[in-house]
């Protein structure tokens, strides 16, 4: 009976002990400013994606004309948006690393967006150049990488928008 009594006493004693209260996490004013910049800049994400996909598809179907310039300008806008949001997002992610509330959501969002960052850079590098031949292969590769990157970024965006805590 002694081992059973000891096991029951240990089990009940473990239940009586309360866990330490969660530590408060305090964010800096700079965190709040970066979060606001990140959030407001993010409003441009989906409209830029829609514009770029429409321009890219039009250019894919009928190469040439002013569409190429417009496509490059919108692409530069996406690159600029992602530069700003990568800096503000990573910086805030580092500051929020000790806050357990919403950690998984922030991590999933961050990983998806960093993967999209890499994809957008690869998209830029894979842009077709009609002067050096193999135009059709390059544009297909460029398109595939771009659409994959947009999908990753949209998933990351929606994770923060609808992901809950």
Residue ranges and their predicted role:
Residues 1-73, 81-103, 163-165:
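N-terminal targeting leaders of membrane proteins
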Residues 40-54, 76-91, 108-125, 144-161:
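Membrane-active amphipathic alpha-helices enriched in small hydrophobic residues
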Residues 59-63, 76, 129, 133:
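Charge-rich, low-complexity amphipathic helices
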Residues 67-77, 102, 106, 136-148:
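Short, charged, amphipathic alpha-helical segments
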Residues 124-141:
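Membrane-helix boundary connector in multi-pass membrane proteins
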